Regions:
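Conserved class I S-adenosyl-L-methionine
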Residues: 1-30
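S-adenosyl-L-methionine-dependent methyltransferase catalytic module, highlighting the catalytic core
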Residues: 7-17, 45, 49, 85, ...
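Conserved SAM-binding loop
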Residues: 23-27, 34-146, 177, 182, ...
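Flexible, charged surface loops at secondary-structure boundaries
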Residues: 29-32, 251
């Protein structure tokens, strides 16, 4: 059962459909008693979704299973838990293996050193736990067409050089296609990564009807050539390469990586 939108003045940092999908992925762990941390929690919209549902179902305080952290904890507004400050060097303020699940919704595209960020997620998750990381899907067809004619993917625009104020750029400084997100997570140490998606865009489906046959043929030729030149690369990346031109990847708004330690 999906959560209802948070009925408060706490603002989400990601689309409602992304919150709903990650909520659906997280709640089975929460119901099993898992410890969860919301990394880059913003004002606490997603934390409130999880915390309020947990409290309603169990009668227990949200802080028994849920934690949150952010670079700017002073803006956190959900009173069910506290928000811990992320350290100045970007490290998370938790011991190794402190959580069963680390969630990060639409944060990684704001991060300068994404490899350091995924290593921190790996560090704070226990063996057998998961990291759930969402980001705008720059591989959907809307984004690919926009990049073709403008040089910029969807949700990523030219940046104001004279200001570091994230209000001028929405903080989107580092687009990461799914392959490179999965690569970073695997390099951090996670043993497997799977792709999930939030909502599928009608406009991207229309583009798929027109471009689908061409993409299928061209990608098949690319894979064949890669298999001849670099068979070891194909073997190591087979699952990620298969996902890149799936119908879901070509049509979804955001992509969500679930990485298992």
């Amino acid at each position: 059962m999906a959560a209802a939108p948070v009925s408060s003045d706490i603002r989400p940092i990601s689309h409602q459909s992304t919150n709903d999908k990650v909520f659906a992925l997280v709640m089975p762990y929460v119901r099993g008693g898992a410890r969860v941390v919301d990394v880059g929690a913003g004002e606490g919209y997603f934390s409130k979704m999880v915390g309020d549902r947990f409290a309603a179902e169990t009668g227990r305080a949200p802080n028994t299973v849920l934690a949150a952290c952010d670079l700017f904890p002073e803006f956190f507004r959900y009173d069910g838990i506290r928000c811990d400050p992320i350290n100045a060097d970007g490290s998370l303020p938790y011991r190794d293996g402190a959580f069963d699940v680390a969630c990060s919704l639409e944060v990684i595209e704001h991060i300068k050193d994404q490899f350091a960020f995924t290593r921190e997620l790996y560090r704070v998750v226990r063996p057998g736990g998961v990291a759930i990381v969402s980001t705008p899907n720059v591989l959907n067809l809307n984004s690919r067409v926009r990049y073709l004619h403008s040089g910029f993917t969807v949700l990523f625009d030219p940046l104001l050089m004279s200001s570091d104020d994230p209000r001028h750029t929405a903080g989107h400084i580092n687009p990461v296609p799914y392959y490179y997100l999965a690569y970073q997570l695997r390099r951090a140490g996670f043993r497997s990564v799977t792709a999930h998606y939030d909502r599928f865009k009608t406009s991207a489906r229309a583009l798929l009807a027109a471009w689908g046959p061409f993409i299928g043929v061209a990608h098949g030729l690319f894979r064949r050539r890669l298999a001849v030149k670099k068979p070891d690369v194909v073997a190591e990346n087979a699952d990620m390469l298969r996902e890149l031109n799936s119908v879901r990847m070509l049509t979804s708004r955001s992509v969500i990586a679930v990485a298992t330690k």
